[in-house]
Amino acid sequence: MHNGHRKQAARDWVKKGQKGRPQTGGVRENMKSLQARYLDRLAELYPTIAAASTEIINLESILNLPKGTEHFLTDIHGEYEAFSHVLKNGSGSVKRKIDDVFGNTLSRQDKQSLATLIYYPAEKMSRILQTEKNPDDWYKITLYRLIAVCRRAASKYTRSKIRKALPKEFAYVLEELLTERGDLQDKESYYDAIVQTIVRVGRAKAFIIALSELIQRLTVDHLHIVGDIYDRGPGPHIIMDKMMTYHSIDVQWGNHDVLWMGAAAGQMGCIANAIRICARYGNLDILEDGYGINLLPLATFAINTYGDDPCTCFQLKGSDSYSASEREMNQKMHKAISIIQFKAEGQIIKRHPEFGLEKRNLLHHIDFERGVLEMDGREYKMLDMNFPTVDPKDPYAFTPEEADIMERLERAFMNCEKLQQHMKFLLAKGSLYKVYNNNLLYHGCVPLNEDGTFKEVEIYGKKYKGKALYDILDNYVRKGFVAVDKVEREKGRDMMWYIWLNENSPLFGKDKMATFERYFLAEKETHKEIKNPYYNMLENEEVLDRILREFGLEPEGAHIINGHVPVKSKDGESPLKCGGKLLVIDGGFSRAYQKETGIAGYTLIYNSYGLILAAHDPFESTEAAIEKESDIHSESRMVKWVPERKCVGDTDIGRELKEKIKDLEKLLNAYYSGAIAEKFTR
């Protein structure tokens, strides 16, 4: 409520007199009652002074542990092999643990072999054992080394947290090996006996795998995915499967993620776009094999409709694995779904004039007799004029065959169990932005005016800007899946398409999506997409501070972590903007961008010592990583070093624990004052 409104409300309250006054005493009594009920509930969990006191001691000890390591990845674009490898090596975090433990006591080659074993234990072990003359000795040496690294990785966690991370099969033995036993006079003999037994009973292989996976898990405490799991790469579904098993994760949706969410919700514009992008990059296997979506009706329609059409405007990008016949088939499907997409989008634009996208409807601006497009007062020669399914009098209407295909695809997307599970995960773990440990995470941009103020955007008749715009769009994405009211659900579905390509969308942030122009017009100036002013203000501290405050952060010491835009390192561009206040960490996993950027992108580590930015060389392959031990070469640099090591007490979780300690201290006071009686326990 604005200050003026508050004053007016106060004046109105005075005019009403005593009769209209709120019963503040009743409110206070209700608050007291609520607090009493809360303490009663807390007393059920901690029924004695001893139990409450012990929990306070435990929580206080956690507050003083080193902060867990956060790992930030973005713009994975379906490149599952590179993603999986970076996840395994923690952007160099595993190697740092190995260096911490062994220093100069192991050769560089031995350290690299140990790191590769931790990343790919089963595969690497099978290769080593093929040539190893004394496997039992190798098992023992390797187990001792892995135990040492695992102890280091576990050192910042409570015993309780480590216990929860242990694989059930080896939980007891691992706990013994990882825990320092001060009560034993001959610890070496004790540990050696355990290791000898593991080897003697034939469980060394399984134990090495379990230890390696535990090191991976303990090295990174929490994973942030700052958008775009989906796009042009071949395995977004594999990445989603991997993410769903990760121990602690959040996702900030990217534009491609929301596109697939819209497709899963049955939004036809999103469905057509998702299929078109798969076709464009030769990844229709994602749909057919990954999600079991039947594309045969589309393929049959494409052959029948474009049988003699070479479809030269719809050639594949970035895929050399197709035969000539497969490539021809793919191009015809690519054209068929593209024309369907332009029609579907035309229907959405007509349905929602408030989206302000009328200028993106271009089919009715084609002069079919002359083969030209009239746009922005100019005429452009069309590169392709074979449109047998487009009626010049009603260009956005589906033919009966197209309508049937889209109805089938809509059912297929909405009834695909695996796709729906993936989208439920994105809804549960994801959002348009995240504020976490004094960092603001989002994909794309905060829509701004030319003067750096927040741009006001109309969404279904109401205006929003800044954080409020993010919140309402996030809300409509969820409505698109769960709203009971059919009208609201339909609005939510269409809003996902809006988020995908509207200039006012935080996830797009360009004046247009020039898909049509890129296919059909040779003039490069028509392909240009002008970015939101946000992208020109990444070095403007005043603007960045305004954004941080808008999302509830004090600018001093806070950071914005931003995905979406590839950083052109080869041209000298830095991912650090405004003295490190904003970090652009497009992961660069997509091979298509690597020629443009010069590297394979950036990832970020935030541990108890500060922020570490890792710049990666391209990933060759999983096979090369195992056989040649060719880890992704990464150059790491400290972006922000903290003079005092950060503890759990300095984090968001720490603040929650401090609140819990306060509540427990109130419970203790209630016990000591006699307001609540201790429970009798035998």
Residue ranges of each PLM-predicted region?
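Feature recognizes metal-dependent phosphohydrolase scaffolds
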Residues: 2-7, 11-21, 25-682
